[in-house]
């Protein structure tokens, strides 16, 4: 599976969906089902995430946009530090993680954030089972992630001491948790702590995202 492509398609689908008004006789689920196969599975995942994040997720139409917001937040954070070092975007992004690994952990975190205050409803589960018949590997992976989302501890282990990726991961989760229910607040607090993000950096990430 190409997680970079999947994440990019999910972000783009959510962004496009937010700018459209469905036909009165056609629900989002109906539209997705007509696509079929793997594309429908990506559409279903977009629907699950978009339902939680709403307009917030339209701010990041790509992994590059997510990285740009995280970099701007880190720059603002660094300016307020006693010993600050100006980093270029390339220096900030220097990481041992491949783009595929970054996309994987960001996508898994977004799913965990979306499910932090509830579970997938039965209709959505049934649609995933039905539409995944043509792409069993992706269907199996998605079903597993939705049934047992990644924990904040596991996320932190995958991220390691990569500040750029940690910032992007937190930012992606925050954009999904638009409503900030009690359980979402707890999830985000635990995520920030597990990622070892400074409170002031978290504040800058939220400000740059428009919260």
Walk through the language-model features, giving the residues of each.
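Primarily EF-hand calcium-binding motifs
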Residues: 111-113
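Small-residue-enriched hydrophobic alpha-helices in membranes
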Residues: 2-109, 123-211
């Amino acid at each position: 599976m190409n997680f970079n492509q999947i994440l990019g398609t999910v972000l783009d689908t959510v962004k496009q969906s937010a700018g459209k008004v469905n036909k009165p006789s056609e629900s989002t689920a109906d539209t997705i089902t007509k696509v079929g196969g793997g594309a429908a599975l990506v559409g279903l995942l977009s629907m699950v995430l978009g339902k939680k994040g709403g307009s917030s997720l339209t701010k990041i139409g790509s992994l590059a946009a997510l990285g740009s917001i995280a970099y701007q937040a880190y720059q603002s954070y660094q300016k307020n530090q006693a010993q600050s070092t100006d980093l270029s975007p390339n220096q900030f992004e220097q990481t041992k993680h491949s783009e595929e690994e970054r996309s994987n952990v960001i996508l898994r975190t977004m799913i965990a954030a979306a499910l932090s205050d509830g579970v997938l409803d039965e209709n959505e589960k049934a649609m995933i089972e039905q539409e995944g018949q043509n792409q069993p590997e992706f269907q199996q992976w998605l079903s597993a992630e939705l049934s047992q989302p990644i924990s904040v501890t596991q996320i932190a282990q995958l991220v390691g001491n990569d500040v750029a990726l940690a910032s992007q991961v937190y930012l992606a989760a925050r954009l999904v948790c638009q409503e900030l229910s009690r359980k979402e607040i707890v999830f985000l607090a635990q995520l920030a702590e597990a990622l070892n993000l400074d409170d002031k950096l978290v504040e800058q990430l939220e400000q740059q995202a428009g919260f």
